[in-house]
From Swiss-Prot:
Keywords: Cell membrane, Endonuclease, Hydrolase, Membrane, Nuclease, RNA-binding, Transmembrane, Transmembrane helix. It comes from Aliarcobacter butzleri (strain RM4018). The gene is rny. Residues 330-423 form the HD domain. This is Ribonuclease Y. Belongs to the RNase Y family. GO terms for molecular function: RNA binding; RNA endonuclease activity. Its EC number is 3.1.-.-. Residues 204-268 form the KH domain. The keyword Cell membrane applies. GO terms for biological process: mRNA catabolic process. The chain crosses the membrane at residues 2-22.
Length: 514
């Protein structure tokens, strides 16, 4: 349509130009040309009208075709929707019919169940009545009530079952006991054979050789002044006249005896033996021993492969070197228990390092028993709790004396190792231990009194020397104190013969000249 209009415009424009040209060229022919142009214009206009009508007709035909196509699609879609709706309605009606039928069936089943339930209740009632009648007949026949008959039957069944269970249990128990014994014996034998420790029984005396008899006179001093100072300061018995060229140092306390022996040896080497020098050497030796105790503990901990331990506990381990139980050195016993505990725990699938730690600390309370009241078990548990030792160590301390049950393999290993070490033939001497306990008890009674500084049992426990503080106890009170201590010893300690209580009160005055 647009092309047609453009053609018409172009033609008209061309005609106008032609007319203009014709006018200019030939006025005479202008009219003819005008007529021709009009004729052409009519032809063109007619053609344009025909083309326009043709285009309109084509457009109408195309619109009708598209409309009919859209109408057909719409009608097809409408039919499809109607069909789906009809199918859904039919399905819904079918479902509703099924639900209605199922509901009717449920109602029918409920009715039948109710009928059966009523019938069962009736039968149950009849059964109970018949049962009661039968029970009454049986009770009349056997002379027992229902409860009595039930008790009799249960008793019989229980007795039969108990006898059978007991028989099975005894058999199984014997087998388990034998197997356990065999396994334990095997473990213990392997652990004992794998550990070869050193052992030496502790003595009560140390002998110091002398070069000549003149040295004895130096030790005794003028009017026995030096030997009295030594015995009072060191807390030991010093015996000079029994053996030629020998000084015997006697004490149940290993630490005091070792310090005394070292002090006397250094005095002999120094040659200057008099009370002031004795006290000076004693302080020096005691300081060295305290340092050695710490090193001894560190060496033991390192030997056992224990990485960390509180310094105070290490110091107490070192002090066990100077403790004895039934003649057995406490540190040697502790080391033996620690090694055996580790071996036993490893064989039982436990932690060998933890077992060795618990074994090392199981008798740690013995390092404190001279200074603090109470059993070594309670003291050891308390000190280990204070320094944050684990529950296994605490349990092992209590368990090895039966105060608690072992809570794990490591604690059980410590208990077994302690029993092995103590029960080994020749490991302990009962007579010596009873003597040591008696002497310790005498010292503890003495030191428990107010104003007492130190107490030393000497002369094989037949005498106790009590050193008191001069500012707290006067001379009259010292006499009363000696009587009180002697009376308490009589009441609490069993001993042969008699024990001499010697209370010593000393006042010192010091001044310096500069």
């Amino acid at each position: 349509m647009e092309d047609l209009i453009v053609a018409i415009v172009v033609g008209a424009f061309s005609s106008a130009i032609s007319i203009f040209v014709v006018r200019k060229l030939d006025r005479a022919k202008f009219e003819v040309f005008i007529e021709q142009a009009k004729a052409k214009a009519k032809v063109i206009e007619h053609e344009a009208e025909m083309a326009l009508k043709d285009a309109q007709l084509k457009a109408k035909i195309e619109c009708d075709r598209e409309f009919k196509s859209a109408k057909r699609e719409y009608e097809a879609m409408l039919l499809k929707i109607e069909r789906k709706e009809r199918e859904l309605n039919e399905h819904l009606e079918s479902e509703l019919k099924a639900i209605k039928l199922e509901k009717e069936q449920i109602v029918e089943k409920n009715r039948k169940i109710t009928t059966l339930k009523d019938g069962l209740e009736e039968q149950k009632k009849t059964y109970e009545e018949k049962t009661l009648e039968a029970i009454k007949i049986l009770e009349n026949a056997c002379g027992l009530t229902q409860s009595e008959a039930k008790e009799l039957m249960l008793k019989k069944v229980k007795e039969d079952s108990r006898a059978e269970i007991s028989s099975i249990f005894r058999k199984r128990y014997k087998i388990a006991e034998q197997n356990t014994k065999n396994e334990i014996n095997n473990m213990l034998s392997q652990a004992v054979t794998r550990y070869a420790g050193e052992f030496a029984a502790e003595r009560l005396i140390n002998n110091i050789p002398l070069n000549d008899e003149e040295t004895k006179g130096k030790i005794i001093g003028k009017e026995g002044r030096n030997i009295k100072a030594l015995e009072m300061l060191l807390g030991v018995d010093i015996i000079i006249d029994d053996t030629p060229n020998t000084i015997t140092v006697s004490s149940f306390n290993l630490y005091r005896r070792a310090v005394a022996t070292k002090t006397i040896r250094e005095l002999l080497e120094d040659g200057r033996i008099q009370p002031a020098r004795i006290e000076e050497i004693y302080k020096k030796v005691k300081s060295e021993f305290d340092k050695n105790i710490q090193k001894e503990g560190e060496d033991v901990v390192m030997e056992l492969g224990i990485k960390t331990m509180h310094p105070e506990l290490i110091k107490l381990v070192g002090r066990l070197r100077y403790r004895a139980s039934y003649g057995q050195n406490a540190l040697a016993h502790t080391l033996e228990v620690a090694h055996l505990s580790g071996l036993l725990a490893s064989q039982m699938g436990g932690d060998a390092i933890l077992a060795r730690r618990a074994g090392l600390l199981h008798d740690i309370g013995k390092a404190l028993t001279h200074e603090a009241p109470g059993s070594h078990v309670d003291l050891g548990a308390e000190i280990c709790k204070r320094y944050d030792e684990c529950d296994t160590v605490i349990n092992a301390i209590y368990a090895h004396h039966g105060h608690e049950e072992p809570i794990n393999v490591e604690s059980a290993a410590v208990c077994a190792a302690d029993a092995l070490s103590a029960a080994r033939p020749g490991a302990r001497r009962e007579v010596l231990e009873s003597f040591l306990k008696r002497v310790e008890e005498v010292e503890n009674i003495s030191t428990s009194k107010l104003g007492v500084l130190n107490a030393y049992a000497i002369n094989a426990g037949r005498e106790v020397r009590v050193i008191v503080k001069a500012e707290l106890v006067n001379d009259d009170e010292a006499v009363l104190l000696a009587t009180e201590i002697a009376k308490e010893i009589e009441e609490k300690v069993q001993y042969p013969g008699e024990i001499k209580v010697n209370v010593i009160r000393e006042t010192r005055a010091e001044s310096y000249a500069r």
